[in-house]
C-alpha cells in the first residue's frame, strides 16, 4: 500500500530526531526498536542528501549570478547549475512521491500449476527457474522452502524465499519486493507440450503469488494458540537422513485457514522457523489487502486488476514473444526472459508504477 506524500520539512525533522535517537544508548537496549529506527533512518538518508545537494546548488547559482554581473565568464556556470538544479528537483520530487513501504523487503514467492496437467506443472517449473536465474544475476539468495513435483519433473507447487541481503547491488531503497512485486497473477503459456504427439500448440497457465517478507516475525502478531503444527517426513533435498526423520513442518493458522509447509531446511527447527516467516508474510499481505479494501473498494479493485489479475502475461513459444497485458509490453526475446533476463520488463513495469505514483503527488 502506497504511503501519502510527505513534505520535505517533515522528513528533515524526522531524520534529525532519528539521528539523535540512534546515538542514544537507551534505544539499543531494545534491539528490535533499534533495528526499526535504523532501517527508517537509512531510507530517509538519500532524501536528505538530495535535498542538501539541491540547497547547495541553489546557493551556488545565486552566487554565480551575482558574479556574472561583473564577469561574463560565469554565464556557462549559471547554465550548468540551472541544469543541475532541475535534475535534483526531479529526483527529490520522485523521492517524495507516495511510495511502497515494502520496497526494500525480501519476498516469499509461490508458483502453482493451473489447468493443463503436466504441461502446466512444467511451465510452473520454468517460471520458478526464471525467477531463480534472475535472482542469481543480481547476487540474491534463493531458498526453495517447499516443492511438490509432477511425474515429469514439473512443479505442482513450489515456495521460494528470495533475499537481497549481502548482495552487491542491494541498498536501503531498492529491494527484491520493489523489483518483483508485479509478478503476482496468472501467467499463460502457448507452446507445443512435450506430451503432444500431433505438434499442436496448447494453452495452459500457472499462478504466481508474491508476498513481502517482514524483517522480523515480531512485526506481525501471531498467537501461538492459533497455530496447529504438524511434523512429517520430508521428501525434499534437505540433507542427509532427510527421509528418515520427521523434519518437515506444516503450520496451519486456524483463524484464516492459511497453511504453510517447509521441508527443505536441514532440521525441524529450521523448517519451523522458515515456515513461521512465510506465514507472517502471508498474514501481513492479507491484513494489508483487507485494510485497502475497507478504505476504498474501488481502489482495491484497481490494485487487484494490476497486481493479481487474470492473465497478466503471455509466453508465446512459437513466436518467441512475451506480452505483459497490463502495460502493453511486448518483446521477442522469450528465450532470454526465461533465462532470467527480466530487467527490461521490470523497468517498464516500474516506470508505469512510478508514473501512477507521481500522479498522486
From Swiss-Prot:
UniProt-recorded Gene Ontology molecular function terms: translation release factor activity, codon specific
Highest taxon above the source species: Bacteria
Leader peptide range in chain numbering: none
Positions bearing N5-methylglutamine: 240
Keyword tags: Cytoplasm, Methylation, Protein biosynthesis
Chief subcellular location: cytoplasm
InterPro entries named among the record's database cross-references: PCRF, Pep_chain_release_fac_I, Pep_chain_release_fac_I_sf, Prokaryotic/Mito_RF, RF-1
Location in or out of the cell: Cytoplasm
Post-translational modification, as annotated: Methylated by PrmC. Methylation increases the termination efficiency of RF1.
Matching Pfam families: PCRF, RF-1
Gene Ontology cellular-component terms listed: cytoplasm
Function as written in the Swiss-Prot or TrEMBL entry: Peptide chain release factor 1 directs the termination of translation in response to the peptide chain termination codons UAG and UAA.
Family: Belongs to the prokaryotic/mitochondrial release factor family.
Protein name: Peptide chain release factor 1
Source organism (scientific name): Mycobacterium leprae (strain TN)
Lineage, uppermost ranks: Bacteria, Bacillati, Actinomycetota, Actinomycetes, Mycobacteriales
Gene for this chain: prfA
Amino acid at each position: 500500500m502506497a504511503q501519502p506524500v510527505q513534505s520535505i520539512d517533515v522528513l528533515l525533522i524526522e531524520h534529525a530526531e532519528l539521528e539523535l535517537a540512534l546515538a542514544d544508548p537507551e534505544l539499543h537496549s531494545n534491539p528490535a526498536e533499534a533495528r526499526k529506527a535504523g532501517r527508517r533512518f537509512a531510507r530517509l538518508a538519500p532524501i536528505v542528501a538530495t535535498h542538501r545537494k539541491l540547497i547547495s546548488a541553489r546557493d551556488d547559482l545565486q552566487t554565480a549570478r551575482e558574479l556574472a554581473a561583473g564577469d561574463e565568464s560565469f554565464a556557462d556556470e549559471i547554465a550548468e547549475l540551472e541544469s543541475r538544479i532541475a535534475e535534483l528537483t526531479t529526483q527529490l520530487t520522485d523521492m517524495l512521491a507516495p511510495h511502497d513501504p515494502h520496497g526494500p523487503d525480501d519476498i516469499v514467492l509461490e508458483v502453482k500449476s493451473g489447468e493443463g496437467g503436466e504441461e502446466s506443472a512444467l511451465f510452473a517449473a520454468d517460471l520458478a527457474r526464471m525467477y531463480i536465474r534472475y535472482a542469481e544475476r543480481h547476487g540474491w539468495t534463493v531458498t526453495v522452502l517447499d516443492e511438490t513435483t509432477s511425474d515429469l519433473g514439473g512443479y505442482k507447487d513450489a515456495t521460494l524465499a528470495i533475499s537481497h541481503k549481502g548482495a552487491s547491488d542491494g541498498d536501503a531503497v531498492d529491494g527484491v519486493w520493489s523489483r518483483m512485486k508485479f509478478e503476482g497473477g496468472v501467467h499463460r503459456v502457448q507452446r507445443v507440450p512435450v506430451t503432444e504427439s500431433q505438434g499442436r500448440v496448447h494453452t495452459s497457465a500457472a499462478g504466481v503469488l508474491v508476498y513481502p517478507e517482514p524483517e522480523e516475525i515480531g512485526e506481525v502478531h501471531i498467537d501461538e494458540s492459533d497455530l496447529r503444527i504438524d511434523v512429517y517426513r520430508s521428501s525434499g533435498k534437505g540433507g542427509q537422513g532427510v527421509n528418515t526423520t520427521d523434519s518437515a513442518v506444516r503450520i496451519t493458522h486456524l483463524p484464516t485457514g492459511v497453511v504453510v509447509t517447509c521441508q527443505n531446511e536441514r532440521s525441524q527447527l529450521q523448517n519451523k522457523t522458515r515456515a513461521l516467516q512465510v506465514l507472517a508474510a502471508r498474514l501481513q499481505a492479507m491484513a494489508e489487502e483487507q485494510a485497502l479494501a475497507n478504505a476504498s473498494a474501488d481502489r482495491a479493485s484497481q490494485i487487484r486488476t494490476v497486481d493479481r489479475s487474470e492473465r497478466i502475461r503471455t509466453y508465446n513459444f512459437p513466436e518467441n514473444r512475451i506480452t505483459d497485458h497490463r502495460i502493453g509490453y511486448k518483446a521477442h526475446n522469450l528465450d532470454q526472459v526465461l533465462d532470467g533476463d527480466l530487467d527490461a520488463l521490470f523497468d517498464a513495469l516500474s516506470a508505469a508504477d512510478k508514473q501512477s505514483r507521481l500522479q498522486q503527488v
